[in-house]
Amino acid sequence: RSLGILVFCLLLFGLCGTAFAAEKTKSPYCITVNLTANVVTVYEKDAAGNYTVPIKAFRCSGGTDTPEGTFRTSAKYEWRALYGNVWGQYATRITGPYLFHSVPYFEKDKTTLEYDEFNKLGTTASAGCIRITVRDVKWIYDNCPIGTTVRMYRGDVKEPLQPVAVPK
C-alpha cells in the first residue's frame, strides 16, 4: 500500500507538480484530464506552491483524437460553435481546436441540450474536446483564468478524487 501511495505522489508531481510551481503561473489551479478514466481533476497549490491538492473531480467525455500533453488555456467563450453544427456552453480553449465545453446543444439555446450526448458522459464520446456538465464546465470557465495549465493523459492512474455520478 505504501508503494501505491508513493507511485501516486510521483505521478501527481509529473502531472502538475514542480514544473509548474507558483512562480511560473498566476493561476490558482492546475487541471488534469485522465482520458482513460474520463475524469477531470482540479488541483490547487500546496504550501510550497505546487499543485498537489485535489479539490474537484468532474466526469467528462474525451475523444479518441484528444491529444495528450501539457497545455495552457488560451481563450473563453460563453457559447461556441462546435464540430457537427452544434453549440457548447462555457467553452475554454485548451489547445488548437480542443476545448473544455458543455455537452452539446442543437442550437445556441439552453433548452436544446442533446440528451443522448449527456448520457454518454464518462465514456469516450467526443470529436476530441472535453465535454463536461454545464455546472462543472461553468466552474472551470468562472474560476480558471486564461493561462491555466491543463495536462491530458491516458493511463490507469487511480484518481485522488472520484467525481459525483452523473444522473441519467
Where are these regions (language model features)?
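Long hydrophobic alpha-helices with heptad-repeat/coiled-coil character
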Residues: 14, 46, 50-52, 127-132
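Sec-dependent N-terminal signal peptides of Gram-positive bacterial secreted proteins and lipoproteins
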Residues: 1-20
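Exported/periplasmic cell-wall-interacting domains
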Residues: 24, 66, 77-168
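Cell wall/extracellular polymer interaction/catalysis modules
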Residues: 20-79, 89-91
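Generic hydrophobic alpha-helical segments
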Residues: 6-9, 47, 80, 136
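Exposed boundary/loop context
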Residues: 7-10, 62, 115, 121
